[in-house]
């Protein structure tokens, strides 16, 4: 009994009434924020690392993994600096300013994961339109919540789905007990063959408190014996440091200027190895090398045709468009085991 009393005093375990009141404050927090501010432009930095833990020939049939499977390398890194245009609390346009990647041709790999880096924590859908946020009033019926309040003015909320579904997540969040503002949150789930853990640190005040300031995503893609691990990190709200004329540039020196934190030794090593291979390849001017390049380009073209979408506009002023889905699409594969 004494221990229970001490626990209640130290941790402020919430009653059902207190829990409902706190959740109500969290759900209502977006309405307490003035979003009538003028449109804004800010900048973001993204760094990612891909590791091929296991692979077989079937990985070649995944459209967004063709270049990784075909490259022969097991580790890839990349970074990007983007211009973000906002309207109220929504991102309306993202422009790539700088990028650097060891993925061949700077191709996008698992592009769906980028959507996880801009979660709409208070929205009805947390990520794009396929995962339901536990911090929206309309989704409360799908989740179970537990809360523990602390004397520092914060409360920890843990949540889990009432039923198993790939559209629901589990995790925890730290919120301001008085206002219901979410300070940090972690979401764990699985969707479309991707297991993920997403950690979010929210902005501090005003409209920025409705948006992530920093995100870290750990994800694993598993498909018929293949396993790709990835780590994505993003930082938002960075200042303007470059001229507006800079777009989609591959410039290491400029990235050194805008990068909000240094690369890890492991990232530096992968970049250095990639650049060393590129220098060696550029110095190889033999006929055999030219033949290898031609063969590689032919295989790249085959891969793009078989596994990538083909789209084209036609007519004056682009009045019509044509899109052909991949000839081989793993999402339509069937298998049993």
What are these regions (language model features)?
Residues 13-110, 262, 267-268, 275:
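Solvent-exposed N-terminal domain segments of exported/luminal and surface proteins
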Residues 2-12:
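Hydrophobic h-region of N-terminal signal peptides that target proteins for export
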Residues 92-155, 159-170, 194:
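Flexible, processing/modification-adjacent segments and terminal tails
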Residues 11-12, 147, 152-250:
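Gly/Pro-enriched, hydrophobic low-complexity segments
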């Amino acid at each position: 009994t004494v221990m229970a009393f001490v626990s209640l005093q130290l941790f402020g375990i919430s009653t059902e009434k207190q829990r409902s009141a706190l959740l109500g404050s969290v759900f209502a927090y977006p309405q307490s924020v003035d979003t009538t501010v003028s449109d804004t432009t800010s900048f973001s930095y993204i760094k990612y690392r891909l590791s091929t833990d296991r692979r077989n020939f079937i990985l070649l049939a995944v459209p967004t993994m063709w270049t990784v499977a075909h490259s022969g390398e097991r580790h890839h890194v990349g970074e990007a600096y983007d211009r973000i245009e906002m309207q109220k609390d929504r991102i309306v346009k993202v422009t790539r300013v700088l990028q650097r990647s060891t993925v061949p041709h700077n191709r996008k790999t698992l592009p769906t994961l980028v959507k996880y880096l801009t979660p709409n924590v208070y929205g009805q859908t947390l990520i794009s339109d396929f995962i339901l946020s536990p911090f929206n009033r309309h989704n409360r019926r799908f989740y179970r919540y537990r809360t523990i309040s602390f004397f520092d003015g914060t409360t920890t909320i843990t949540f889990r789905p009432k039923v198993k579904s790939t559209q629901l997540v589990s995790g925890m969040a730290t919120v301001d007990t008085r206002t219901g503002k979410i300070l940090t949150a972690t979401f764990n789930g699985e969707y479309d063959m991707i297991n993920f853990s997403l950690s979010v640190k929210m902005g501090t005040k005003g409209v920025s408190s409705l948006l992530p300031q920093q995100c870290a995503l750990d994800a694993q893609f598993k498909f018929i014996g293949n396993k790709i691990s990835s780590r994505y990190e993003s930082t938002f709200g960075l200042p303007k440091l470059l001229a507006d004329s800079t777009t989609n540039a591959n410039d290491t020196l400029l990235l050194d200027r805008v990068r909000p934190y240094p690369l890890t030794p492991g990232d530096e090593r992968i970049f250095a190895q990639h650049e060393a291979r590129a220098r060696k390849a550029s110095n190889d001017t033999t006929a055999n090398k030219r033949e290898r390049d031609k063969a590689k380009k032919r295989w790249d073209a085959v891969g793009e045709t078989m596994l990538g979408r083909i789209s084209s506009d036609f007519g004056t002023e682009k009045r019509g468009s044509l899109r052909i889905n991949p000839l081989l699409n793993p999402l339509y594969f069937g298998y049993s085991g």
